[in-house]
Amino acid sequence: MVHVVLPKSQMDKAGELPGKFADTAIPAIVQRMVEMGASTSRLKAAIAGGAQLFQFGVSSSLDVGARNSEAVIAALRELGIPLQAKDVGGSVGRTLRLVSDTGLVAVRTIGGTERELAVLGKILSSSGVAA
């Protein structure tokens, strides 16, 4: 699971914070999963978030949430990882929950109720490696 803060890593000149940016976090977590034995052909993704929590008028360039969502989708596409489900945009934050033994991904908007977003399949085998 990744929680990105910004879409592009260009501000991270030293490359010290790859998990903070969509364009580096997605490849980094996929690389780590492969190192642990996962097969990229079996990976699937579900994403949630990308809300515009702060209003800045009509400037879409300041809509970091939308830019994050677009960057995550682009990174997944570039890596060939299918996007199974998404719940993005709007103006309300979300909480995401992953049940690792079933692959259930649930999302809850702030002040709302939890709902199933996707079932990605069994995530962990008994050895802890992606099944």
Regions found by a protein language model. Give the residues of each.
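Conserved mixed alpha/beta catalytic, RNA-binding, or beta-rich assembly cores of soluble enzyme
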Residues: M1-M36
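Short glycine-rich phosphate-binding loop at a beta-alpha junction
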Residues: S41-G49
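Acidic, glycine-rich active-site loops and adjacent beta-strand->loop/helix elements
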Residues: V5-Q10, G49-L53, G89-S91
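Surface-exposed interaction patches
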Residues: L43-K44, F56, I81-P82
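Phosphate/ribose-phosphate-bearing ligand recognition and processing surfaces
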Residues: Q52-G65
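Generic secondary-structure signature for well-ordered alpha-helical cores
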Residues: Q31-S39, Q52, R77-I81, D101
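Divalent-metal-activated hydrolytic enzyme cores
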Residues: G65-A131
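Conserved active-site and cofactor/substrate-binding residues in soluble primary-metabolism enzymes
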Residues: K20-T24, A28, A38, R42, ...
